[in-house]
């Protein structure tokens, strides 16, 4: 049985009970390029998969999720879509599809009704959805069909409607372009749309659209006078490029570089609205120090350029937001969005593939979505920040919200405690050897899950940049490999060491009012810590420990998945 037939049967059944199916013209056609329908966890649809068996679209059958996109409607509703499925995303295989949820409370909770987009052909998949508002006020959902097989677009005609599962109207999927875009199009000041695409695994090309809204035509054409085709080096097969318009009307295009090219990004400029481009020039300076991962760049309402990328070349961690007020020449402001450490398996992918909504909130809020641990944590997360937060380098406004869950799949436990008694904050005198610090830390750590289960780990503590004679704060991390199983694992397995000259020995360590008691370290991860140990001497070196007395360190889960009823 074809997948389309199975889907249509489920759609007919769903029409008899809540939620009703949206008015999607394409789902009635056997040859539809994509089909869409609404579902819930209580009424999921079976689907055939490549090995001849069946599964459902339920969250419990999804093996991974990632690559989110977000848009905010004029009425304030948020729509968020991402790719998921049963197949391993990295294999570019079939059986992956797109899902779309909505929120009516500024992203605090998300609907338990969701929209499924899939393809009738079992041999291909849907990938990398993109939500895109054009200058005419139309909201588009762009769906990439099967790797390099092109893209389709669906217009969401009334995205602010009441009860979307019953009342959302969508247009028939139209062929968007023959090559897949990695980002939503950039709308230029002349009204044109422009996007870089992957022509094949060896080259990139620029597509330009001059939309005719009155005629309902949105033709994409490649540049003709000087085709903007860039031949990739031998060890670069794709770039996921994105374009931003500068204040003088010129265009800046950025493209990711693989690690064996040195990491970072390539930069090219156009001075004729994308008809021709300068040769790419590599840059791995801040903020272009990418670990070969997708980034996001856009111009904000203030005119500033927002860049979201990683603050390291080492791995897909330390996701940060940067601001430039001089057209990308410098980025003096940075806010760390998510420094979750999800190492241990390359398939965890860290925190990656960010996107910011093109629409800002009424208070200047910037809505940023990304994935966290595609195969371990299996989370879609959101940060809400303002320019003031980014310029301050920390949350300073009442609107700032960090690392919130939009969706989390099951399959792994959240580990919230550790049974070992070790100090998380240590202050040492300059000259203290690393070995004196390591001697105080356990060689094994047992993690405790929310259900009481235990996971013993054996490993070593390490800090590669520790310099005993240089004052500052250093992070020691436990090397026991856990493949992204815990949202707060990165906090549980870190010790923060401050090298600082001791000014004065406390006269009474047990008296918290004594002026000699060191101030408790200010760290968001330690907000629930209680208790102190002062004045411990190890190996002849004076080490002042500021840490927990309790035998169990408790870092509670910061967010739990929430579904709007």
Regions found by a protein language model. Name each.
Residues 30-410:
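Asp-box/BNR beta-propeller blade signature and adjacent active/binding-site loops
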Residues 9-19:
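Bacterial N-terminal signal peptides
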Residues 17-30, 531-532, 551-558:
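Sec-dependent signal peptide cleavage junction
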Residues 501-531:
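C-terminal low-complexity, Ser/Thr- and acidic/Pro-rich disordered "stalk" regions positioned immediately N-terminal
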Residues 545-565:
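C-terminal membrane-anchoring or membrane-association module
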Residues 451-499:
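Serine/threonine-rich, repeat-prone extracellular segments and beta-strand-based repeat modules
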Residues 533-544:
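Single-pass type I membrane protein transmembrane segment
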Residues 407-453:
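Solvent-exposed, low-complexity, repeat-rich "mucin-like" stalks and linkers
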